[in-house]
From Swiss-Prot:
Disulphide bonds in the chain: none
Gene of this entry: rpl20
GO biological process, one term: ribosomal large subunit assembly
SUPFAM superfamilies on file: Ribosomal protein L20 (SSF74731)
Protein name (record): Large ribosomal subunit protein bL20c
Similarity comment: Belongs to the bacterial ribosomal protein bL20 family.
Major localization listed first in the record, in broad terms: plastid
Keyword field contains Cell inner membrane: no
Classification via CDD domains: Ribosomal_L20 (cd07026)
GO MF entry, a single one: rRNA binding
Native source species: Pinus koraiensis (Korean pine)
GO cellular component, one term: ribosome
Length: 120
C-alpha cells in the first residue's frame, strides 16, 4: 500500500476549528479536542437562539405597541382587532418603530380609527 502524506491537510482542518473558537477561555481555545466540542456546542446554541431571537423581538414589538396604545386609551388587543377588521394587516415591527420614533404619528393613526364597532 502506498504511503499517504496529508499532514498539512490535517493541520489546516485543526487550525480552522481553533480559529473558530479563538474567543473561548482556557483550554477551549488551545486544545483541539475541547475546541472541537466547544464548536459543536456553539453551533447548537446559535441555531437554537436564531429562533429565540425572532420570538423575543416579536414580544418586544408587541410590548412597545401596547404601551403606546394604552397611552392613547386603547389596549393592544383592541387595536390589533380593529386593524384586522378593517383588513389593515399590521406589521408589528413597523408599528413599534412608529410608536417609539414618532409618537405623534402613532397617536394620529389611533385617532383616525373609529372604535365604535369594537366597543359594542
Amino acid at each position: 500500500m502506498t504511503r499517504v502524506k496529508r499532514g498539512y491537510i490535517a493541520r489546516k482542518r485543526r487550525k480552522k476549528i481553533l480559529a473558530f473558537v479563538s474567543g473561548s477561555r482556557g483550554a477551549h481555545s488551545k486544545l483541539f479536542r475541547t475546541a472541537n466540542q466547544r464548536k459543536a456546542r456553539a453551533l447548537v446554541s446559535v441555531h437554537r437562539d436564531r429562533g429565540k431571537r425572532k420570538r423575543d423581538l416579536r414580544r418586544l414589538w408587541i410590548t412597545r405597541i401596547n404601551a403606546a396604545a394604552r397611552a392613547n386609551g386603547v389596549s393592544y388587543n383592541r387595536f390589533i382587532q380593529y386593524l384586522y377588521k378593517r383588513q389593515l394587516l399590521p406589521n408589528r415591527k413597523t408599528l413599534a418603530q412608529i410608536a417609539v420614533l414618532d409618537s405623534n404619528c402613532f397617536s394620529t393613526i389611533l385617532k383616525n380609527l373609529s372604535y365604535d364597532e369594537i366597543n359594542r
